[in-house]
Every structure is written in C-alpha cells, then in structure tokens.
C-alpha cells in the first residue's frame, strides 16, 4: 500500500534541516544519516548522503532520477557472494 498523496513525502526532520542548511550556504558536504526511510525530494539533488547499511555508511549521490525513491533503496544491506559454478573441484 502506498503513502497517501495528501500526507506528502516523509523526510526525517533532522535530515531536512541539514539539507536546508547546506542549500542556504551553497555547500555540498557529505551528510551522514541512518534514516533509510526518508524519501528523496527535489531539494536533495546534487547532495551526497552517507546512508548506513547496518555495517558502514555507503555514499549515495542523488540525481533527478532518484526523486520519489527512498534513501535505503540505494544502499544494499546484504552482500551476495555468488553461487559456486562447479562444486567438484572443492570436493577433491
């Protein structure tokens, strides 16, 4: 179920405050955040966020195509090591 249009996008207040401060100053420093649930809004474009994946902070540079998605979508939490192609070599 999607979020109601009348409610608007959810962005953590502390994260929005940091973005507004940087936009006012005209700087684009990396913003470290644990808020994977925050939706990317148009004023986030051009900023780099360090999104926490449970172990480390993954840098995410926001572009126009990311607007409407959540920050957590661009910082995967699970690492896929890959499937073993042929198990016969390891059995020897």
UniProtKB/Swiss-Prot annotation:
Superkingdom of origin: Bacteria
Any one of the GO CC terms: small ribosomal subunit
Keywords: Ribonucleoprotein, Ribosomal protein, RNA-binding, rRNA-binding
Listed InterPro entries: Ribosomal_uS19, Ribosomal_uS19_bac-type, Ribosomal_uS19_CS, Ribosomal_uS19_SF
GO BP terms: ribosomal small subunit assembly; translation
Entries under PROSITE patterns matching the protein: RIBOSOMAL_S19
Molecular function in Gene Ontology: rRNA binding; structural constituent of ribosome
HAMAP family: Ribosomal_uS19
Family designation: Belongs to the universal ribosomal protein uS19 family.
Role played: Protein S19 forms a complex with S13 that binds strongly to the 16S ribosomal RNA.
Protein name stated in the entry: Small ribosomal subunit protein uS19
Originating organism: Bifidobacterium animalis subsp. lactis (strain AD011)
Lineage, top ranks: Bacteria, Bacillati, Actinomycetota, Actinomycetes, Bifidobacteriales
């Amino acid at each position: 179920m999607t979020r109601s249009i009348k409610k608007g996008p959810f962005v953590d207040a502390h994260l929005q405050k940091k973005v507004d401060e940087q936009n006012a100053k005209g700087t684009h420093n990396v913003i470290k955040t644990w808020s994977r649930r925050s939706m990317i809004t148009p004023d986030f474009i051009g900023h780099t966020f360090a999104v926490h994946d449970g172990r480390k902070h993954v840098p995410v540079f926001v572009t126009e195509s990311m607007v409407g998605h959540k920050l957590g979508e661009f910082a995967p939490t699970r690492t896929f090591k890959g499937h073993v192609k042929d198990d016969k070599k390891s059995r020897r």
